Each structure stands twice: as structure tokens, then as C-alpha cells.
Amino acid sequence: AGAYTLFGKAIPPHHLAIATIGTVVALVAPKPWSPKVKLEPKIDASSPEEEKFIKEYLEKHL
């Protein structure tokens, strides 16, 4: 079976496949040590009362 030559060394195709899959998984997998991003939209209220009302409404209905 043929091997690829990289940097003057013969690399078997299955090693390249394993390296490719490992790289893709490492880049795509979620990182448990990364800081958690809170998925909450910014409340742009015109007054503190309105902001309080919006927060209470969201807590009640979501």
C-alpha cells in the first residue's frame, strides 16, 4: 500500500486519517473549561421600573 511523504518521512494513510479526525474533534468539541456565556439578551429599558417589569415577566413566562 502507498504511503504519503511528508517532510521526508513516509506516513501511512490511516495515520493521516486519525490525525485529521482528532483535529476536527478537538476544534469542534465543547470546551468544559471555557467560561460559560450567559445567553440572555440585553434589556434596553427606559426606566428602572420598566427593566424590573421585563425581568419579572421573563422569569414568569420562560
From Swiss-Prot:
Keyword check for Lyase: no
Membrane topology: Single-pass membrane protein
Transmembrane segments: 14-30
UniProtKB keywords: ATP synthesis, CF(0), Hydrogen ion transport, Ion transport, Membrane, Mitochondrion, Mitochondrion inner membrane, Transmembrane, Transmembrane helix, Transport
One biological process term in Gene Ontology: proton transmembrane transport
Major site of localization recorded for this protein: mitochondrion
A GO-annotated cellular component: mitochondrial inner membrane
The family this protein is said to belong to: Belongs to the ATP19 family.
Statement: the UniProt record of this protein carries the keyword Membrane: yes
Official protein name in the record: ATP synthase subunit K, mitochondrial
Record's subcellular location: Mitochondrion inner membrane
Record InterPro entries: ATP19 (IPR021278)
Organism annotation: Pichia angusta (Yeast)
Function comment: Mitochondrial membrane ATP synthase (F(1)F(0) ATP synthase or Complex V) produces ATP from ADP in the presence of a proton gradient across the membrane which is generated by electron transport complexes of the respiratory chain. F-type ATP synthases consist of two structural domains, F(1) - containing the extramembraneous catalytic core, and F(0) - containing the membrane proton channel, linked together by a central stalk and a peripheral stalk.
Complex and partners: F-type ATP synthases have 2 components, the catalytic core F(1) and the membrane-embedded component F(0), linked together by a central stalk and a peripheral stalk. The central stalk, also called rotor shaft, is often seen as part of F(1). The peripheral stalk is seen as part of F(0). F(0) contains the membrane channel next to the rotor. F-type ATP synthases form dimers but each monomer functions independently in ATP generation.
Domain of life of the source: Eukaryota
Alphabetized Pfam families for the sequence: ATP19 (PF11022)
